[in-house]
Regions:
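C-terminal hydrophobic helical "lid"/dimerization subdomain
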Residues: 2-3, 281-332
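Short amphipathic alpha-helix with an adjacent loop that forms part of the alpha/beta core around
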Residues: 206-216
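Glycine-rich phosphate-binding loop and adjacent beta-alpha segment
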Residues: 173, 229-299, 331-332
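N-terminal Rossmann-like NAD(P) cofactor-binding module of classical short-chain dehydrogenase/reductase
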Residues: 154, 222-223, 245
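Mid-domain Rossmann-like dinucleotide-binding core that forms the NAD(H)/NADP(H) cofactor-binding site
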Residues: 84, 128-204
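Short, glycine/polar-rich helix-capping loops at beta-to-alpha or helix-loop-helix junctions
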Residues: 104, 182-189, 254-259
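NAD(P)H dinucleotide-binding glycine-rich loop of Rossmann-like/cofactor-binding domains
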Residues: 82, 91-157
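Glycine-rich beta-strand-centered segment in the early N-terminal region that forms part
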Residues: 25-43, 54-96
């Protein structure tokens, strides 16, 4: 193995072009860490926001980036059983900081508690397309929302990897998904992925369609990463005593709180991220739930497009185009 490796870092915040390949000494894992020889990277919207300096974590220059990698463990630090060397694993978002352990690179050093095995039937590309989407959806819909058979669940940004995961979880739990997308271009694919209903907001009134689908009852759960002005419409479409999960802030404008609607219907409007789930005692149960459904084939990571490692800037640009349905993956 070479004494140096290529690691993607950025030395200032900004557009995709700030990402650069830095040739660095091969890093050694510290106590309770492992090193992966990376085979695939799964991109997430959080990494775009981090690169832009608009994320929950502030970049420390020069900063690493990347939450999700799949690969083979080739070294272990102190306090980690060496029998893990040679095993195929993927990294789990929410268990480490991007500044400390960002995984964009030929190798990645991450905490031992930040890895997980996945079914051997999955490819490296699929292995890098699991934990952010399914854990995020599980935490809101199952852990906190307690989705039940027959519930109506509104899923905005439904063509994202998290949105697709939410569709799958809603289906296996016997609930009914109402997926929201801006244009008709993605409607057919969302239906193919298992959406029960699709609302195209450029052509249809969101509140009217939800009321039509639910026979006027509204949705018990709303799962939204957008915020902004759509929150008022989502509140209007939510059933009395329903819950709205805000798990992102994709809208560039402020998010007004729909006070009167919330008061009138006793709504819960709740902020949530995967970082709330990962330290909780339910975390192992969440991972097992996801593993089991991946193994059974009920969950199947949808990969929209793959890029080579040298094209990671193009991969970031593609994510920002919002053309994808599912996961964008970088292969090494």
């Amino acid at each position: 193995m070479s004494n140096t490796v290529k690691i993607v870092r950025f030395h200032k915040t900004g557009p995709a072009e700030v990402l650069q390949f830095d040739e660095l000494p091969l890093p050694e894992p510290g106590p309770n860490e492992v090193r992966l020889r990376v085979k695939a990277l799964g991109l997430n919207r959080a990494e775009i926001m981090f690169r832009n300096g608009q994320y929950l974590e502030t970049p420390v220059s020069p900063s690493k980036n990347g939450y999700e990698a799949a690969g083979i463990i080739d070294a272990t630090g102190a306090d980690v059983d060496t029998s893990w060397v040679g095993k195929t694993v993927s990294t789990v978002p929410g268990t480490f900081k991007l500044n400390d352990h960002g995984v964009y690179g030929e190798v990645a050093v991450v905490p031992f508690h930040g890895i997980a095995e996945y079914p051997s039937t999955l490819s490296y590309e699929q292995g890098a397309s699991i934990w952010m989407q399914y854990l995020t959806a599980y935490g809101a819909l199952i852990w906190l929302g307690q989705v039940a058979k027959g519930d109506f669940v509104v899923i905005t940004a439904a063509s994202s990897s998290v949105g697709i995961a939410a569709i799958e979880i809603v289906k296996v739990e016997g609930a009914i998904s109402i997926c929201v997308t801006r244009t008709a271009a993605k409607k057919a694919e969302l239906l193919k992925q298992g959406a029960d209903h699709v609302i195209v907001t450029d052509e249809e009134d969101l509140v009217a369609r939800v009321n039509e689908i639910t026979s006027g009852k509204g949705a018990r759960i709303v799962f939204d990463p957008i915020g902004g002005k759509i929150l008022e419409s989502l509140a209007a479409a939510t059933a009395p005593k329903g819950i709205i999960f805000e798990y992102g802030a994709l809208a560039p404008e402020p998010t007004p709180y729909p006070l009167f609607t919330a008061l009138a219907k006793y709504l819960t409007i709740r902020a949530y991220t995967v970082f709330e789930l990962t330290p909780d005692p339910v975390f192992p149960k969440a991972k097992q739930y996801i593993f089991d459904h991946l193994a059974s084939g009920a969950f199947k990571p949808l990969i929209d497009k793959t890029f080579h490692f040298a094209e990671i800037v193009d991969a970031h640009r593609y994510m920002e185009s919002n053309a994808q349905i599912g996961k964008i993956v970088v292969i090494l």
